[in-house]
């Protein structure tokens, strides 16, 4: 027998190798799940009598800092920010301020220290030393929430003052400090025994004290007294392959630092500084004035190159901080510039409201020459189109120009709604005889009475109110020329037919409120945390919502309306007035047609930081690392489940 040629033998070996090999792709091995381990530090952790301003903290592998400017907190606060950097396996910290005597310093890294390859975080890592004989080790922790909507507040400073005077917050930097994470949580470390005031501050100028009304703040009325005690908690070792199964539950003995559940409600004070922010002539026929704060009165205008008497229709919002002036005279509208003297109240250097006079020039964005050129160009274009059509024997129909009006009268009208008329420009006159409402009775339309009412909040908006009956059909007619605008145009005719929904089309929610104040207001919210409807709690501590849409999710918020003005009000530090309290019902309702829900709500039953559902929070927690999940997925692919 002839020997097998070498190339055939080699081919057989290769075929045999592939026949025995796995058909899958080569596996690169498990992911690194181990965070960096602390090895040593100079000075040693919790060292006393330290005078060194340079710190070196070493780990067992190459590391990096993740978002150090957000996550690394140094206490007490420093006038000149220390330098924090990475060098291989080490974190280096250098202080530039003179170290204070007999003071505990903490460098809280949070989860900023991660390994160089997989970003595994060394969570909850902090380093401390003392310049004196003793090191302070107690902690104070809690959560900062936005007072008006219970959103977690990320990145706000939280500080302690040993000085218990109210003035300390506005005159002195904090003694100890921390910063909230994405969940609003904070931990102030290195705290000595004693009594403290606690504050939160969104410190825009980084001076660690409240000196600007634009800064969000929070404060507690009560003192904070740090304490600690031994405690036991249960911990769990989870199954590596099954996230729903655990291997072991064991007890962990630890030192619990108190208080650990403080709630601070963050708010911005009402801006007390009154001044003109800007003036703007948005269009030929109107201009607007914008002020920095709400006002009790409107400014007074005196024309310097025109007669201001009966010259404007004025629209202002409820705060009187945004005011729109519609110019009634069309000739006056065409003027490039309007100059006037404005008298109003403004805040002086002493913080007092005093009379002030400004001279303002309202300039058209497009001057008259350019406007005339544009108009001539449009006329030429129209004439060209007319001649083109004329050659074809076609005539260009001249469309009359009407006063623009939109009618919100849906074909299926909710029982708790009305027909709404909206106008782009102010209305001069409404002929109510030209408006007709009718109901269908045995296939015939019968006129019914109605009320036409101007909206008290929204300018240029009117509502048509009638005795809407469930399941009935209605007809709205508005004759042409029935409504006239201030520039002489009239509305076109309108005809709408609509049918009112039945009672069976809605769900109903009955609430029994426990723990609310004497003037509480309940707000029904949508999935964007926006207010759909609101109404006060009754003397019997009930609040009922009718005509709720089926297959719609509703959420509920309550605020204690202390001054009984129907709106939520912010706080004031100088007056020691907290913002009005807000609560969320930690539940969502998905309404059903022809279905009634009844619920008792104790507003204090669930801690404040657990009340607002995650699904409607805008401030989401930072994404946690999920390397272990990747290893579980790898195990499944390898058939090791």
Report the location of each language-model feature.
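N-terminal targeting or signal-anchor segments and their processing/structural boundaries
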Residues: 2-641
